[in-house]
């Protein structure tokens, strides 16, 4: 599709690739495509904090222009809520730094000439700052990240062993080029083949004290996007 867009004169500005469930994408290949077709590469790394790609824990900013983290309570580490953006691009860093705090500019030459007290807002920004308590919690969690990920992998091994003889279930793929962070362990089921209804399965599992979830309903199926 990138080649097709190029042929008709359309430019792709950015591509977002998701390390879904904790499994890193093929980032080296994606990086080569971004160079070839001149687009920004964004790594949605929210599920894969603690994963490694080709034995590199810091693979995110090595291959992508922007890496996004989520520190929601169910993620591999948490600050209670919130997240972060990682980048090695100074221009992107400066832009994000402004956007996170109402786009208040205290550092430009124009502002400095007005006096040390002066600041300016040139466009709409946001209130996306983590507070000190959230940061302290995040730092304490970060120190235990390796243990958290190891525990998730141990649990995943138990699931794999339990379902190893169930050919009607498709388990998460473990690529040989990466180490999985197992934010999720999605099991895919062919409901037509198994002759099981999804709602019946969910209700039965709930009776057993196990809450299942669908991860995720595709964005294009939500009315907000449909109405666009």
Roles of regions detected by a PLM:
Residues 1-79, 84-91:
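Active-site phosphate-binding strand-loop segment of PLP-dependent enzymes
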């Amino acid at each position: 599709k990138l080649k097709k867009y190029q042929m008709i004169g359309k430019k792709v500005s950015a591509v977002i690739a998701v390390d879904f469930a904790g499994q890193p994408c093929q980032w080296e290949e994606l990086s080569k495509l971004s160079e070839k077709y001149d687009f920004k590469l964004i790594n949605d790394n929210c599920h894969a904090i603690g994963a490694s790609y080709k034995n590199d824990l810091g693979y995110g900013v090595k291959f992508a222009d922007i890496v996004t983290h989520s520190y929601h309570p169910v993620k591999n580490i948490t600050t209670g809520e919130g997240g972060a953006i990682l980048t090695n691009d100074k221009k992107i860093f400066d832009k994000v730094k402004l956007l996170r705090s109402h786009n208040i500019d205290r550092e430009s030459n124009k502002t400095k000439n007005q006096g040390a007290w002066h600041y300016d807002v040139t466009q709409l920004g946001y209130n996306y700052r983590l507070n000190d308590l959230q940061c302290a919690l995040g730092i304490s969690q970060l120190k235990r990240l390796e243990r958290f990920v190891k525990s998730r992998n141990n649990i995943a091994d138990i699931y794999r062993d339990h379902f190893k003889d169930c050919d009607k279930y498709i388990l998460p793929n473990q690529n040989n080029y990466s180490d999985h962070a197992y934010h999720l362990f999605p099991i895919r089921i062919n409901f037509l083949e198994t002759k099981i209804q999804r709602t019946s399965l969910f209700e039965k599992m709930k009776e057993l004290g196990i809450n299942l979830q669908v991860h995720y309903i595709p964005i294009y199926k939500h009315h907000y996007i449909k109405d666009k």
